[in-house]
Amino acid sequence: MTTANSASRPNINVDQAELDKFSALAARWWDPESEFKPLHAINPLRLEWIQELAGSLQGRRVLDVGCGGGILSEAMAQAGADVTGIDLAEKSLKIARLHGLESGVKVEYRAVPVEELATEQAGQYDIVTCMEMLEHVPDPNSVVRACAALVKPGGWVFFSTLNRNPKSFLFAIIGAEYVLRLLPRGTHSYEHFIKPSELAASARQAGLEPSGMRGMEYNPITQIYSLSGNTSVNYLMATRK
């Protein structure tokens, strides 16, 4: 899918195949038993960790980069934040807006590249979240720099992505996509996974200081996700400007 917005921005940092992939699934964003079931399951954990480090979201201005259907955006808004969610998948944003109308949760959604928004609203957000997005774009460093530009001095930027090692290939691709079928086949590309050391270096180069990291684990027997110190597969990184 080439949207009007993406067609007018020929040099934006987007993988069209990735955009098409998520656009095709857009109608199922808010079905907790769909391909997005893992995101629904980990969302409370992500929100709790953000609040644990950054404090109350009440009255805070928050940007959710790569918001998709708005799962995290709505949760942060329900916690009292003034949330803007951005994504380039127009179909996902349409679903996010419709769900917001149904739930009564107010979130502003925009179809704009994070790099473009950084030139418009530099230093205007207390918190920026960029969850499960970096591994889906051609230039993750560009996204990190834009997130750093958008957050206020002293503000927080939270990332989550996948480590790159044999274990993450086995668990995140073979296990999650082919054996347990938690995700559609082809959701992830191993070469786009990012080591924590690489993300930390990118953050520092952008003026962000890594301030905490947690791993995300899944127990296939209990079907429960939890945060842990094991960052070998999925991990979250908190940084501060």
From Swiss-Prot:
Binding-site list for S-adenosyl-L-methionine: 46, 66, 87, 131
EC numbers: 2.1.1.222, 2.1.1.64
Keywords associated with the record: Methyltransferase, S-adenosyl-L-methionine, Transferase, Ubiquinone biosynthesis
Record-level GO BP terms: methylation
Pfam family, one: Methyltransf_23
Catalytic activity: a 3-demethylubiquinol + S-adenosyl-L-methionine = a ubiquinol + S-adenosyl-L-homocysteine + H(+); a 3-(all-trans-polyprenyl)benzene-1,2-diol + S-adenosyl-L-methionine = a 2-methoxy-6-(all-trans-polyprenyl)phenol + S-adenosyl-L-homocysteine + H(+)
Transferase recorded as keyword: yes
GO terms, molecular function: 2-polyprenyl-6-hydroxyphenol methylase activity; 3-demethylubiquinol 3-O-methyltransferase activity; polyprenyldihydroxybenzoate methyltransferase activity
Pathway per the UniProt entry: Cofactor biosynthesis; ubiquinone biosynthesis
Domain of life: Bacteria
Broad class of enzyme this protein falls into: transferase
Record InterPro entries: SAM-dependent_MTases_sf (IPR029063), UbiG_MeTrfase (IPR010233)
Role: O-methyltransferase that catalyzes the 2 O-methylation steps in the ubiquinone biosynthetic pathway.
NCBIfam families: UbiG
Family (UniProt): Belongs to the methyltransferase superfamily. UbiG/COQ3 family.
Name this polypeptide is given: Ubiquinone biosynthesis O-methyltransferase
Native source species: Bordetella avium (strain 197N)
Encoding gene, per UniProt annotation: ubiG
